[in-house]
């Protein structure tokens, strides 16, 4: 169980880094701040390194311990969570790179015109925090509620990222 606890602890650490990375990327977007954008981009390397470390830990536990069905389900679920957390970090990096690109194109001052980006980002960060809390407590009911909420956030984000506002950056 020490190995499983070590994995859980590292996943929570990785999640905290990604939460900070997303907050930094959103702040960079909101302010048009290139330094914050670079910080979010730089954080991606640490997140990717943690993903590789955690993948090795998971493989080691499966190979060495031959976990019971219950532990194996938890380990596989954790492995999927690791991939999802890393992907969230990749999305934060994309936001930060967009800030740099928009600045290069002279659209840095127009970023505030993008409807609902900051609000949608805050909702996503809140969901990530709730997910990490549910993971830390192994709270299945909380996780199920987050999955339900996620569907609404996806719809809102798609509406926010409508191509119409993208054209505003090209005028």
Cite the ranges covered by each PLM segment.
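Cytosolic, long alpha-helical scaffolding segments
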Residues: 1-171
């Amino acid at each position: 169980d020490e190995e499983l606890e070590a994995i859980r602890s590292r996943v929570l650490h990785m999640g905290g880094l990604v939460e900070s990375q997303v907050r930094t990327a959103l702040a960079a977007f909101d302010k048009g701040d290139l330094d914050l954008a670079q910080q979010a981009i730089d954080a991606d390397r640490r997140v990717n390194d943690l993903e590789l470390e955690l993948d090795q830990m998971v493989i080691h536990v499966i190979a060495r311990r031959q976990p019971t069905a219950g532990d194996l389900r938890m380990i596989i679920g954790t492995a999927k969570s690791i991939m999802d957390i890393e992907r969230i970090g990749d999305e934060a990096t994309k936001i930060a790179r967009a800030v740099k690109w928009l600045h290069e194109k002279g659209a840095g001052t127009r970023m505030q015109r993008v409807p609902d980006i900051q609000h949608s980002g805050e909702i996503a960060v809140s969901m990530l925090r709730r997910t990490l809390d549910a993971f830390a407590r192994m709270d299945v009911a909380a996780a199920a509620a987050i999955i339900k909420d996620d569907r609404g956030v996806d719809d809102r984000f798609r509406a926010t990222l409508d191509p119409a506002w993208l054209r505003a950056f090209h005028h």
